[in-house]
């Protein structure tokens, strides 16, 4: 297993699953707030609260999905069947969520809440097994980095395809009828996402076998929570997605009201996405050269500095804004695949500590905190815009609203990146030397007794 080299076809196949997820995820992150406030016509404050409350359901659905996936037995494996058979209902609900039925004001609020909640549930059904799949395709740390690098290059391409093409599709399909355009645009993208998920199913294979679970769901949840490195990566995941969600969700408002033209949005977003593609491709060579944890925290520190600097860019300095967003795009997507590899490492760490490989529930918990970050980001945008007096129908916005939009686009992400750098530097201990020692022991069948798991100390010599 350790020496198995993954084929390019399988890496592409796995990456297609991430591309499909990002077609929907990035679209929701960038457009759904705008769609609800400016197209469907519901208040920004309500949308923010709805985003946050929907996560309460995820607190139940995500771990349940992970536990269910861990206990799945089929001829296709544990995780792959969920990817294929969840894809069609996922795509259908995406279209419903972006539809604008003729309803009363209260009817619109109920419709938005129901369809958005269904969308998050079906995202869970597809994406938790997909995330866990990366941990069972191979247990080779180098191959995992390569797999995740391919995944995030294709994920970035999928997100770029979705977000850059969305407005042209809206205009082509709907013309002046933006409601029809959004519905038709997401329908086209949902079909593409389904085909990608099917390709992922047929080209990947689960190789890392875990013994059948003999413990209860409650015990599995307890063991995951006791994994201190999983908790650290969970916090890093919230901060990472909060940064990108707030910046992404504010981008349409930023180009419209700060840069002065909504027409700049596609070019601005494309510049960011091109940077993302380059960043994804750089992750593997950089982590071959330097410990991935060091790359992670140094990059986050640099992102914090750049984000603060962007706050002071004059409103009429368009070229400077494009340069900043390109560099930020490169650096942000450089750390994202590293973070997912770190999550896979925490699964191995948990197995090394207590002999239990809890891949599904581990990634379920990660997806929950990821969606929590998404919800917090959406809620923060909605609440801050509402607090600043944002008026979607106005021709100009007041100075408080403009300052809030700039802060959402720059300072809020800066805080997230700074916290990520500090936490990774101080608390994440699964660095390359220790990982090599740990994986060698796992390969030999060495397991630490469960009673030692609470402390699970790491020798100082392996932390550096």
Where are these regions (language model features)?
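Membrane-embedded alpha-helical bundles of multi-pass transporters/translocases
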Residues: 1-464
């Amino acid at each position: 297993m350790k020496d198995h080299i993954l084929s390019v076809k399988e890496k592409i196949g796995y990456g297609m699953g991430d591309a499909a997820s990002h077609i929907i995820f990035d679209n929701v992150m960038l457009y759904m707030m705008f769609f609800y406030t400016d197209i469907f016509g519901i208040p920004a404050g309500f949308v923010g609260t709805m985003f946050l409350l929907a996560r309460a359901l995820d607190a139940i659905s995500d771990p349940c999905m992970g536990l269910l996936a861990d206990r799945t037995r089929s001829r296709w494996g544990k995780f792959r069947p969920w990817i294929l058979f969840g894809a069609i209902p996922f795509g259908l609900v995406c279209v419903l969520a972006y539809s604008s039925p003729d309803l009363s004001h209260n009817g619109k609020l109920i419709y938005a809440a129901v369809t958005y909640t269904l969308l998050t549930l079906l995202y869970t059904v597809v994406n938790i097994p997909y995330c866990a799949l990366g941990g069972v395709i191979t247990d080779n740390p180098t191959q995992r980095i390569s797999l995740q690098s391919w995944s995030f290059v294709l994920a970035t391409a999928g997100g770029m395809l979705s977000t850059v093409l969305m407005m042209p599709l809206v205009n082509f399909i709907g013309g002046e009828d933006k409601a029809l355009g959004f519905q038709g645009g997401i329908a086209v993208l949902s079909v593409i996402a389904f085909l990608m998920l099917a390709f992922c199913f047929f080209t990947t294979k689960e190789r890392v076998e875990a013994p059948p679970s003999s413990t209860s769901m409650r015990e599995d949840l307890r063991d995951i929570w006791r994994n201190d490195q999983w908790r650290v990566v969970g916090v890093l995941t919230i901060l990472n997605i909060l940064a990108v969600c707030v910046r992404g969700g504010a981008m349409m408002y930023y180009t419209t009201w700060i840069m002065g033209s909504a027409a700049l949005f596609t070019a601005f977003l494309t510049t960011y996405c091109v940077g993302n593609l380059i960043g994804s491709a750089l992750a593997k060579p950089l982590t071959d050269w330097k410990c991935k944890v060091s790359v992670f925290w140094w990059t986050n520190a640099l992102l914090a500095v750049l984000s603060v600097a962007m706050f002071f860019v004059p409103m009429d300095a368009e070229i400077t804004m494009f340069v900043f967003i390109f560099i930020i795009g490169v650096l942000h997507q450089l750390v994202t695949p590293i973070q997912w590899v770190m999550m896979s490492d925490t699964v191995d760490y948990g197995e090394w500590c207590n002999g239990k490989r809890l891949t599904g529930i581990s990634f379920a918990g990660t997806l929950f905190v990821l969606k929590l970050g998404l919800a917090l980001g959406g809620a923060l945008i909605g609440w801050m815009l509402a607090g600043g007096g944002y008026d979607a129908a106005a021709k100009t916005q007041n100075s408080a609203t403009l300052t809030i939009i700039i802060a959402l686009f720059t300072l809020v992400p800066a805080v997230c990146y700074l916290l990520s750098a500090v936490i990774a530097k101080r608390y994440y201990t699964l660095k390359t030397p220790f990982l090599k020692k740990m994986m060698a022991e796992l390969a030999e069948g060495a397991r630490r007794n469960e009673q030692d798991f609470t402390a699970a100390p790491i020798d100082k010599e392996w932390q550096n």
